[in-house]
Amino acid sequence: MDVKAYMQKLGQQAREASRQLMVATTRQKNTALLNIATALEEQAETLKTENAKDLEQGKANGLDAAMLDRLALTDKVINGMATGLRQIAALNDPIGEISDMNYLPSGIQVGKMRVPLGVVGIIYESRPNVTIDAAALCLKSGNAALLRGGSEAAYSNRALAKCIQSALHESGLLPTAVQVVETTDRAAVGEMIAMPEYVDVIIPRGGKGLIERISEGAKVPVIKHLDGICHVYIDDDADADKATRVAFNAKTHRYGVCNAMETLLIADSRAAEILPGLVELYEEKGVELRGCEQTRAICDMKAATEEDWATEYLAPILSIKVVDDVDEAIDHITQYSSGHTESIITENLTTSRQFLARVDSSSVMVNASTRFADGFEYGLGAEIGISTDKFHARGPVGLEGLTSQKYIVLGDGTIRE
């Protein structure tokens, strides 16, 4: 196969479809989403049959149990995807929204209109449900989608693509509005991220290695986050019960997610009071603790190294550091944070405002678990990922994050004097 020619063709078709989607009505887009949901339910047995081929191949290739679990399309997963599509259909459509309309002395009206980005390329690993999530968010926001899933889910993704494209056709939209890259040749990724004439933005979802490779080679903007080194700081003026509850949840609610706490910071004045009980809870849960010298003087645990402060564990491991005050906590966060999510536990309004203003992460919280850093929890309905960059989107990327804006100017034969 000529991979370059294949990707160019997909890109051309996506660009053409994006022009139709740009002016599609909310009703058309919602109908398409609902039709995809119905197609998934009607084709559930076919989807499971194709998915079984991926699972069989995955076992032969030595994929571990966790990976196979993420790969599986069960009835529950398929029903969940259909439900998600219907939920996205129920969300407000951001496209065409007009804001900040002002009359100016020159006689013109100037405002902003929300518009799609165009063609969104999404590169991801393992989970075939991302195919549906990505397609749904792109369609609702008026974008064409070019999807490149992992080779381990090739059969599943092709089957899902058939459901999507038949539903698009039935809805009066171009089936090429959502295309799955069917070749497993890795050269396809290199071509996909180097087609600025056809692709407007790339969103990689997967491990750090994948995201770094995409970022380094892309010739189009990339929406991404590399790490989730999240912190919780227990302040001098923290409520002890709140501190214990939040710090425990932020670490133990789920380990392998980017918004789990990886480092706990605690003010020296509160360490001896709060740490013993909290450490006992962590140990009962099976969390391995690594502490600074002051922490280890209070509770017995492994010594933390310099590397620990800069590590996203994605595992039941936690680093703990005692700091003098909020200034030292912020300095530590500034040095080691990945810019994802940080939280302060305090009853002091002045300190909380200082923390909110000075901590430069995509989500900054007061008296809340870092586990809330999620598009659904933020009321966005769904998310395509989380961005720790400052352009174009930051934080959980929902429908609005997949849009841009243009200025609109209204006159009445108005000329510039």
UniProtKB/Swiss-Prot annotation:
Keywords: Amino-acid biosynthesis, Cytoplasm, NADP, Oxidoreductase, Proline biosynthesis. It holds the Pfam family Aldedh. GO terms for molecular function: glutamate-5-semialdehyde dehydrogenase activity; NADP binding. Pathway: Amino-acid biosynthesis; L-proline biosynthesis; L-glutamate 5-semialdehyde from L-glutamate: step 2/2. GO terms for cellular component: cytoplasm. PROSITE patterns: PROA. It is found in: Cytoplasm. It catalyses: L-glutamate 5-semialdehyde + phosphate + NADP(+) = L-glutamyl 5-phosphate + NADPH + H(+). SUPFAM superfamilies: ALDH-like. InterPro entries: Ald_DH/histidinol_DH, Ald_DH_C, Ald_DH_N, Aldehyde_DH_dom, G-glutamylP_reductase_CS, Glu-5-SA_DH, GPR_dom. It comes from the Bacteria. This is Gamma-glutamyl phosphate reductase. The gene is proA.
